[in-house]
């Protein structure tokens, strides 16, 4: 049997607060709920899913590098590999909700482009219906797809797209 494609789901800053942070915008579903549903769905699509969340830009960049088999320098933190058993295992695609780093992080953009791993950008809220500073994304012009405003279902839509429509 062929090995399943490995997908990495990355969530950025403040997404660990889903379910309690501004529920009128983000809803009441927790990140844990989203990750559990994503694991179930990934299994049904014969995908292997690893999840990762960090409030720190450098940790997200390191995790993207690890997804391509690159590791941080020995002087850098080793905590990601210890906390994430999938770290360092090459992945076929990344689904990323970069949170506020969407609008600020050239570093995350460069990490995604530098690894060459195709990625889907996801946002729980419709960023285009919010404050003007949220309208610009440093990632969307390079993403295979962008999903926003669907609430937690956006993650499901991203996994469905990756599992059924992406060519690896």
Swiss-Prot record:
Q: Tell me which Pfam families the record gives.
A: DHquinase_II (PF01220)
InterPro entries the record matches: DHquinase_II (IPR001874), DHquinase_II_CS (IPR018509), DHquinase_II_sf (IPR036441)
Catalysed reaction(s) here are:
3-dehydroquinate = 3-dehydroshikimate + H2O
Q: Which positions are catalytic residues?
A: 26 (proton acceptor), 123 (proton donor)
Transition state stabilizer (site feature) positions: 21
Pathway(s) this gene product operates in, as recorded in its UniProt entry:
Aromatic compound metabolism; 3,4-dihydroxybenzoate biosynthesis; 3,4-dihydroxybenzoate from 3-dehydroquinate: step 1/2
Assembly, in brief, is:
Homododecamer. Adopts a ring-like structure, composed of an arrangement of two hexameric rings stacked on top of one another.
Instruction: Describe the family membership recorded for this protein in Swiss-Prot or TrEMBL.
Output: Belongs to the type-II 3-dehydroquinase family.
Instruction: Enumerate the PANTHER family for this protein.
Output: CATABOLIC 3-DEHYDROQUINASE
User: What is this protein for, i.e. what is its function?
Assistant: Is involved in the catabolism of quinate. Allows the utilization of quinate as carbon source via the beta-ketoadipate pathway.
Q: What is this protein called?
A: Catabolic 3-dehydroquinase
Q: What is the lineage of its organism?
A: Eukaryota, Fungi, Dikarya, Ascomycota, Pezizomycotina
